[in-house]
Amino acid sequence: MTLSEINAQIMFQTNNDIDDLGDFKPHITDYINQGYDLLVEAYTGEHVTADSETYPALVDNSDKPNLPEYSHRAIVDFATYLIYRNGNIVKQNRGQAYYSAFYEVLVKLKYEGGTRNKPLRFINIYKD
């Protein structure tokens, strides 16, 4: 998913609510990169930064997250959750489902673990 596809999916998940668009549109890229950073940290232990070669922040509409394809939808879910979290109680309840979906993928990425979370196996713990 590219950044523009992620933006389009967020608009779809928020029901294209024009009334709220002005409130969250300036922050939507920050929300996306925040979710991306959480997933990258769970997967590799690194953080998303603007000058990173492996995990740069998503800025251009053609940028793609450098994570497994199945996790891209979780970035959308996290951004949608952040949009809904400051709304009325109905919107907050709606946002919880998106956070739960995000968290499931976060746990899966952490378990899958790129380099940081791989299970360790000791062949011999005693020195001869």
Model features per residue range: what roles?
Residues N88-Y98:
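Short conserved catalytic/interaction loops centered on acidic-Pro-aromatic/His motifs
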Residues K25, P65-E69, N88:
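Short, charged/polar micro-motifs that form catalytic or ligand-binding hotspots
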Residues T80-G87:
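Extended, well-ordered alpha-helical segments in internal regulatory regions
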Residues E69-F78:
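Elongated alpha-helical scaffolds
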Residues M1-K64, V107-D128:
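Conserved short "hinge" loops at termini or chain/domain junctions
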